[in-house]
């Protein structure tokens, strides 16, 4: 599995701000989108381009445009929604597919409770977005769904990842590409990434419980 931890100075700076315990919902949303934009830049560096001719202000100009495959962004509900605008700011024409996953309390297995994929998803690059890669169970399930729908080029962007989750995904799907702002130390006894970001979904949606 191709794993890239993007250690750009801007990402390091913004990630440090995201980790603050006293961060506001507004700032968390904005920083999450900004880091996502920087990850998107890296995750799309290998897209093919072709020359095309346009009429410029001083005559015809040869420029380039992205060629070939189109893209669908796949946020995992609910926290993945907080990264969506960060991708759309750079790829406004991308189509959006949505996956909702939850753990079945009886079997402890991850199940899909919501799935809305674009009709031609099999012919698109699928870019999964989710702030946290912790145990890896949800991400493995999401990739399973996309592959079952015919997707062949699957890329994942997460803000922070735990080594345990990376290992789980790599064992199940060694052919995907993973981009993250940070590979953190690991999971604590409660399954939270350390140092991590806390509950990214709560911080994005403003549902953090106050003491």
Curated annotation (Swiss-Prot):
<dbReference type="GO" id="GO:0004845">
    <property type="term" value="F:uracil phosphoribosyltransferase activity"/>
</dbReference>
<protein>
    <recommendedName>
        <fullName>Uracil phosphoribosyltransferase</fullName>
        <ecNumber>2.4.2.9</ecNumber>
    </recommendedName>
</protein>
<dbReference type="GO" id="GO:0044206">
    <property type="term" value="P:UMP salvage"/>
</dbReference>
<keyword id="KW-0342">GTP-binding</keyword>
<keyword id="KW-0021">Allosteric enzyme</keyword>
<feature type="binding site">
    <location>
        <begin position="198"/>
        <end position="200"/>
    </location>
    <ligand>
        <name>uracil</name>
    </ligand>
</feature>
<dbReference type="InterPro" id="IPR000836">
    <property type="entry name" value="PRibTrfase_dom"/>
</dbReference>
<comment type="function">
    <text>Catalyzes the conversion of uracil and 5-phospho-alpha-D-ribose 1-diphosphate (PRPP) to UMP and diphosphate.</text>
</comment>
<keyword id="KW-0328">Glycosyltransferase</keyword>
<dbReference type="InterPro" id="IPR005765">
    <property type="entry name" value="Ura_phspho_trans"/>
</dbReference>
<dbReference type="InterPro" id="IPR029057">
    <property type="entry name" value="PRTase-like"/>
</dbReference>
<keyword id="KW-0808">Transferase</keyword>
<keyword id="KW-0547">Nucleotide-binding</keyword>
<feature type="binding site">
    <location>
        <position position="199"/>
    </location>
    <ligand>
        <name>5-phospho-alpha-D-ribose 1-diphosphate</name>
    </ligand>
</feature>
<feature type="binding site">
    <location>
        <position position="103"/>
    </location>
    <ligand>
        <name>5-phospho-alpha-D-ribose 1-diphosphate</name>
    </ligand>
</feature>
<dbReference type="GO" id="GO:0000287">
    <property type="term" value="F:magnesium ion binding"/>
</dbReference>
<feature type="binding site">
    <location>
        <position position="193"/>
    </location>
    <ligand>
        <name>uracil</name>
    </ligand>
</feature>
<feature type="binding site">
    <location>
        <begin position="130"/>
        <end position="138"/>
    </location>
    <ligand>
        <name>5-phospho-alpha-D-ribose 1-diphosphate</name>
    </ligand>
</feature>
<dbReference type="GO" id="GO:0006223">
    <property type="term" value="P:uracil salvage"/>
</dbReference>
<dbReference type="InterPro" id="IPR034332">
    <property type="entry name" value="Upp_B"/>
</dbReference>
<dbReference type="GO" id="GO:0005525">
    <property type="term" value="F:GTP binding"/>
</dbReference>
<keyword id="KW-0460">Magnesium</keyword>
<comment type="similarity">
    <text>Belongs to the UPRTase family.</text>
</comment>
<dbReference type="InterPro" id="IPR050054">
    <property type="entry name" value="UPRTase/APRTase"/>
</dbReference>
<comment type="pathway">
    <text>Pyrimidine metabolism; UMP biosynthesis via salvage pathway; UMP from uracil: step 1/1.</text>
</comment>
<feature type="binding site">
    <location>
        <position position="78"/>
    </location>
    <ligand>
        <name>5-phospho-alpha-D-ribose 1-diphosphate</name>
    </ligand>
</feature>
<dbReference type="Pfam" id="PF14681">
    <property type="entry name" value="UPRTase"/>
</dbReference>
